[in-house]
Design a protein with these regions (language model features):
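C-terminal catalytic domains of large/alpha subunits in multi-subunit enzymes
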Residues: 1-187
Length: 187
């Protein structure tokens, strides 16, 4: 009852940019960590919880990137870099995928179970896109197929996926989180 939860609203909170991939874990996570650090400084200085009631602990983190096509040496295009590798095991008779092993360096895994789910989802999306999905459109870019005929994998058709989350400190921000968004679509 002492905590007020507000939904995201740019009328009352600053715009933190797009929520894409794992960007918010990094950007918002680091801003939150910095604000918590300020609170902890007050606690170490002897302030009680009652003394801190009503005090605002605010921090920002801006991950600077260069504009696309910037004429600068060593342009920065992403806030975080990860690493992933996959092994695809095929049935030698049918050519079908039996299993995919996908290992991803995510820095510090803030939510390991979510990381596994993100890897599995990215693998399914990638093999569907690579092997059988079609999204036909007409000359006006209007879809001409029904959802059920797009070639999406059904649950019973998905091969075994062994998602390996490599959890180790990454960047010196956001408690070491790197990200797990886009890189899962590599296979």
């Amino acid at each position: 009852e002492d905590i007020i939860y507000e939904r995201s609203n740019t009328w009352i909170s600053p715009d933190s940019g797009t929520t894409s991939g794992s960007r918010q874990t990094l950007i918002t996570g680091e801003a939150c960590r910095r604000a918590c650090g300020k609170l902890m400084e007050d606690k170490k200085a002897g302030l009680s919880v009652e003394d801190m009631i009503g005090k605002v602990y605010y921090a920002e983190y801006l991950a600077k990137t260069d504009p696309l096509g910037a004429n600068v040496p060593n342009p920065v295009s992403h806030v975080a870099y990860g690493y992933a590798t996959q092994v695809c095991i095929l049935d030698s008779k049918t050519g079908k995928i039996e299993e995919i092993v996908a290992a991803h360096d995510v820095g510090k895994a803030v939510n390991p179970l979510s990381c596994e789910g993100q890897i599995e989802g990215g693998v399914v999306m990638s093999i569907g896109f690579a092997l059988r999905e079609k999204y036909p459109i007409d000359e006006n870019c209007k879809p001409i197929s029904k959802y059920g005929s797009l070639g999406l994998f059904r649950a019973h058709e998905i091969p075994k996926i062994d998602a390996i989350v490599i959890d180790k400190p990454g960047l010196k921000v956001a408690c070491g989180a790197i990200g797990i968004g886009e890189i899962t679509s590599i296979p």
